[in-house]
Amino acid sequence: MAGTGTATKALARHILKVAPKSAKVVFENAVVRVIEITMRKDQRIPMHSHNKGLSYSLNKGKIRSMDEYGKSRVFNVKKGELSWSDEGESHVVENLGGILRELSIEFKG
């Protein structure tokens, strides 16, 4: 069962586990889980992953994201911007601006 290892890997490093003070569940049902993520200026969230889903920016900001292979990219995030994430994609995120807030809408199963 190839999918089992990926799901376990993603769950072990899920953002709710590595950043419990920054990430909180604001809605959950059988289909989706919505997580509100708040990052302080210069805050760094260690290597983590999300389930497959969308991220919605509640305000503008600037972040640096580094994937599990060391590739680093800087993003200027716009208020209202949507982005897609595949399940198991791991990354470190560093907030390069002021307080940053987003909603992570994760699909289950």
Give the label of every model feature segment:
Residues 39-42, 51-52:
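Short coil/turn motif common to extracellular beta-sandwich-like domains
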Residues 48-50, 91:
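Histidine-centered divalent metal-coordination motifs
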Residues 50-69:
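Glycine- and acidic-residue-biased ligand/ion/polar-headgroup-sensing regions
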